[in-house]
Amino acid sequence: VDMAISGLNKSDLILLAARPGMGKTSFALNVALNVAKAVHKTVAVFSLEMSREQLATRLLSSEACVENYRLKTGSLRETDWEKIAGAATILNKVDIRIDDNPMLSVADMNAKCRRIDSLGLVVIDYLQLMTSASGGRSGENRQQVVSEMSRMLKVMAKELNVPVICLSQLSRANEKRDDKRPMLSDLRESGAIEQDADIVMFLYRDDYYNCLLYTSDA
């Protein structure tokens, strides 16, 4: 991925889009962890869907190479404990700040990030859950709101001079096609997102649809 996009560049708005279940959050957390470890800067993660505890568990699972469900259920093997201890030591040395307030606007995030010294990366999970500056007045055109927020995210990336990775949901349009691979036209609720983003990346797993097809045929 680094070779394809030439790494994470300052002031870039990077859109990471996929259908639910493709691994957007896990991918973004891995990027966040790698940045925090490699450049020793603070990574701000705004999670509008999952709690701080859920994300912390995922980070620990990823670093320890222990299945997430084992951590959540406590069904750990004896060999897992040493891995977890080592991963916890590493995570304790990096500065990843998770804010799980589900009602944050772009302006709120910008203000919080400005108070962080040595900021290296911002991750937002995810665009369609964000609140507009007006607080979501009734009668608002959601497509216009999302378009406005994507523009504000680009402005934020430039003002903070750090890369901003924003996760986004896709519409169901790809599921109606024989070729399930996502396209720019599948971006949900906004035709302007691809104009504001410097990079648009899609996550796609062919086995996800093959598995569903096999199940339905059975």
Language-model features: where?
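Cytosolic-facing regulatory segments adjacent to core modules
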Residues: 2-3, 26, 30, 34-118, ...
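Phosphate-binding P-loop
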Residues: 5-10
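P-loop (Walker A) phosphate-binding loop of NTP-binding proteins
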Residues: 19
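Conserved glycine(s) of the Walker
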Residues: 23
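Phosphate-binding/switch loop-helix module in NTP-utilizing enzymes
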Residues: 97-156
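Substrate-engagement module of ASCE P-loop NTPases
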Residues: 145-164, 189-196
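Conserved small/polar residues in nucleotide/adenosyl-binding loops
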Residues: 214-218
